């Protein structure tokens, strides 16, 4: 009997069934962690871990780091690896149902593979079953560049990878046909897509990508979730990827209601509350960090509202920067008046009252 059990166990591991179970959990809000800094501009890894734990406390399905531009471009290789290691250590010591996702983004294939190999090494040493995320190569120019980049990643990755479709205006977004082809040829690695095209273009692309089911498992909404409700109800997206950790309570409620389907009771109201929270226009509006940093401070997760900001700007919106300019940063602080803080506080308090009435923790 012991031999039979051992044979079945080896067979299950060998067929990748553990990864398949993991893959079934890759949906819902996968929130990108904002990078916290000390007063001297160095990365505050302790607060990074606290931020991830806050999301996990609200049953956020997944968290991702490093994935936003500033966390990729303005951090050194050593800083990115140190943050990844800190998060893996937290998941090792305090296992969570929230799926940890490590970004292995690279300027080119060589750099991406370095991060992917380091991530796999961390997985082997820690035993933590995290997944990966990767945007296209920063200096990619053609769809062939993108194809070769993701094919190379598939030779290293032993776990699911979420493909983010956008990096900058100089690198094209991978076509739906390419994304479907990758999902079909590498079913244990690809099939999870963060569709980050701008505005209405995203809707057309999401529909095309979902034509690739069942190889395509999940298409995530993006861009802060402005169209998340429409894209879920009318198109069939199954999650959101955005830098919105401070709003984990309301995103978890929205997802709870989305999963109910026709039995949902407050989905429209919950989504309206979420939209209110992320679209306050009486302050300087930054869709990624901005006043979300204030909420993280208010929650005791962050110590300040400091950010690394690009010193050099591209010649045109969302263009690429030369390698020597891409990593240059200055330390800036988001500032709010007492009146602005008072209104933000009132909004967050109202959000939490709504969440506490409707969310089943």
Where are these regions (language model features)?
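General structural feature for long, well-ordered alpha-helical segments within catalytic domains
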Residues: 44-47, 51, 79, 83, ...
């Amino acid at each position: 009997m012991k031999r039979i059990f051992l044979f079945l166990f080896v067979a299950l591991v060998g067929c990748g069934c553990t990864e398949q179970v993991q893959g079934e959990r890759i949906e819902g809000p996968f929130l990108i962690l904002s990078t916290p800094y000390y007063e001297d501009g160095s990365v505050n890894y302790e607060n990074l871990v606290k931020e991830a734990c806050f999301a996990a406390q609200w049953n956020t399905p997944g968290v991702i780091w490093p994935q936003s531009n500033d966390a990729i471009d303005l951090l050194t290789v050593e800083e990115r690896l140190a943050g990844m290691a800190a998060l893996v250590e937290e998941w090792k010591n305090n296992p969570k149902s929230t799926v940890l996702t490590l970004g292995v983004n690279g300027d080119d294939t060589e750099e991406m593979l370095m991060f992917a190999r380091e991530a796999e090494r961390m997985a082997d040493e820690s035993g933590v079953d995290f997944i990966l995320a990767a945007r296209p190569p920063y200096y990619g120019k053609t769809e062939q560049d993108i194809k070769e980049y993701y094919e190379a990643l598939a030779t290293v990755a032993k776990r699911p990878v979420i493909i983010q479709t956008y990096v900058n205006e100089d690198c094209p977004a991978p076509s739906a046909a390419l994304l479907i082809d990758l999902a079909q040829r590498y079913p244990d690695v690809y099939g999870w897509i963060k569709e980050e095209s701008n505005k209405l273009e995203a809707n057309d692309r999401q529909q095309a990508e979902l034509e690739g089911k069942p190889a395509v498992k999940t298409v995530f909404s993006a861009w802060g979730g402005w169209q998340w409700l429409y894209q879920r109800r009318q198109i069939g997206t199954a999650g959101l990827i955005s830098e919105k950790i401070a709003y984990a309570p309301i995103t978890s409620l929205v997802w709870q209601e989305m999963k109910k389907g026709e039995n949902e009771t407050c989905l429209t109201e919950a989504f309206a509350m979420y939209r209110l929270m992320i679209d306050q226009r009486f302050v300087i509006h930054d869709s990624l960090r901005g006043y979300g940093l204030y909420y993280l401070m208010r929650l005791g997760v962050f110590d300040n509202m400091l950010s690394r900001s690009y010193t050099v700007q591209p010649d045109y919106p969302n263009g690429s920067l030369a390698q020597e300019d891409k990593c240059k940063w200055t330390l800036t602080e988001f500032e709010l008046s007492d009146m602005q803080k008072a209104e933000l506080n009132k909004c967050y308090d109202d959000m939490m009252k709504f969440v506490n009435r409707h969310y089943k923790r």
